[in-house]
Amino acid sequence: MAATMVLDPKPSSTPPPTLPNPYTTDSQSTDSEDDLYTRLKTLDRQIEFIDIQEEYVKDELKNLKREQLRSQEEVKRIQSVPLVIGQFMEMIDQNNGIVGSTTGSNYYVRILSTINRELLKPSASVALHRHSNALVDVLPPEADSSISLLSQSEKPDVTYNDIGGCDIQKQEIREAVELPLTHHELYKQIGIDPPRGVLLYGPPGTGKTMLAKAVANHTTAAFIRVVGSEFVQKYLGEGPRMVRDVFRLAKENAPAIIFIDEVDAIATARFDAQTGADREVQRILMELLNQMDGFDQTVNVKVIMATNRADTLDPALLRPGRLDRKIEFPLPDRRQKRLVFQVCTAKMNLSDEVDLEDYVSRPDKISAAEITAICQEAGMHAVRKNRYVILPKDFEKGYRTNVKKPDTDFDFYK
């Protein structure tokens, strides 16, 4: 009996296995390779562009360096020629400004691009091109001024012991000048302001300038020495500017002492001036008065003035608040003459026969400078005679030479 075949009427739920499509995989791989290739080409183009930019920057840098060298050479060439000294007045913009020349004229000028604009302040000293008046350099504050500080090596070696007599004058000037600078707290505790200025006055040769030299030697403060006639300059405005420079320099180096010798050259009593020179001197005096009693007064700057003609000075200068202390240097009396003779002959090789008291007791009115000249002339007379010892006749010769003058001498002073 043949076997019968039974067919399952329900189909199987498991799907037949399928094979991967080789065409689909190749297409995706090709797309990925195309993307990578495109990115590679893009990066290559970017690298090439960056290389081109780098070469351009290098070339531009070389050009700028050459331009910089040419500009530096041009600046050196401009600054190498003689320049005109001027004064900066006002900044208009970053490239232009107004300057004043020494002739009194003001100019609207171009400012060199290499100049530091922060240095361009009013009243600053500048250098101008001689032809175009362009501002090419800024000078140091004291470059065009004859005023300068005395360094430690330049300070005189005069001490208080080298000045015979003048004990009262020494004490007064030390109280008015040295003590406020070294012990200012003493004045604060007492509740007073120290003197601002000191006037030394008296006949010629009585030790005014020498005492100021001793002050300069004994103090550590900056010392500025100027003669009154130095403020009188050729062009208008130069004198008052020098006065401002002196006080500015003193304030920058405070504590400082300003010594103005022969102050009567600029501080005579004011009058109705008829000439430009007289008006300029009066402007110098007014600037001096303002600097000594201005709004920006500082206690660390002391002023010493010396003159032979205190009677001609302007009353505004002599008032308290400017010159608080006035120290007189009279002709030496008998005791003062003895001290001056002792100081002058301390290092001299005198004979035992020399009696200095004889010259001290003589009634002639002589100054300390004349006593120094007597001792010097006595030494010169001994040298002329080839002697190493000074005899009484040498002193007598020196005394007659400097004191016993004929009445006909120096008639032009009368």
Swiss-Prot record:
SUPFAM superfamilies: P-loop containing nucleoside triphosphate hydrolases. This is 26S proteasome regulatory subunit 6B homolog. ATP binds at G202, P203, P204, G205, T206, G207, K208, T209. CDD domains: RecA-like_PAN_like. The lineage of its organism: Eukaryota, Viridiplantae, Streptophyta, Embryophyta, Tracheophyta. One of its GO terms (molecular function) is ATP hydrolysis activity. The keyword Transcription does not apply. Induction: Down-regulated in response to mixed metal ion contamination (cadmium, copper, lead and zinc), but not in response to zinc ion contamination. PROSITE patterns: AAA. Residues 55-81 form a coiled coil. Belongs to the AAA ATPase family. GO terms for cellular component: cytoplasm; nucleus; proteasome complex. Signal peptide: none annotated.
